[in-house]
């Protein structure tokens, strides 16, 4: 069974989201996603400063098995990317919840209401 930390929020597209003290959201892919994909060999992340809508494909994760889009969980502006993750994408396999991919600042009027909690995500992947 996959690891699903209770303190995070999730999407049904297998991204995890952590709300930071300054209100930005840190986004990564879940343990279930990395396990399903297998050995990750490449990450393409969004550009800092890019405005995105919830559900937009903002990047790509490629593994030896498949390529999959990475989706924005909310509407907002990309404020940071984890360049270390693009340099060593295999680190996501070893620590899916420790290796974040990008940070996003919520757009005015945007919310996190559509994100799901750990219990709902656990049911989704069981």
From Swiss-Prot:
UniProt remark on cofactor binding: Binds 1 lipoyl cofactor covalently.
InterPro entries membership: 2-oxoA_DH_lipoyl-BS, Biotin_lipoyl, GCV_H, GCV_H/Fam206, GCV_H_sub, Single_hybrid_motif
Keywords (A to Z) from UniProt: Lipoyl
An individual GO BP term: glycine decarboxylation via glycine cleavage system
Domain of life: Bacteria
UniProt-listed Gene3D superfamilies: 2.40.50.100
One matching Pfam family: GCV_H
Entry keyword annotation includes Disulfide bond: no
Cofactor(s) for this UniProt protein: (R)-lipoate
GO cellular component assignments: cytosol; glycine cleavage complex
Domain Lipoyl-binding stretches: 24-105
The keyword Nucleotidyltransferase appears for this protein: no
PTM sites of type N6-lipoyllysine: 65
Annotated family: Belongs to the GcvH family.
Job of this protein: The glycine cleavage system catalyzes the degradation of glycine. The H protein shuttles the methylamine group of glycine from the P protein to the T protein.
Assembly and interaction partners: The glycine cleavage system is composed of four proteins: P, T, L and H.
Entry-linked PANTHER family: GLYCINE CLEAVAGE SYSTEM H PROTEIN, GLYCINE CLEAVAGE SYSTEM H PROTEIN-RELATED
UniProt name for this protein: Glycine cleavage system H protein
Taxonomic source organism: Burkholderia cenocepacia (strain ATCC BAA-245 / DSM 16553 / LMG 16656 / NCTC 13227 / J2315 / CF5610)
Higher taxonomy: Bacteria, Pseudomonadati, Pseudomonadota, Betaproteobacteria, Burkholderiales
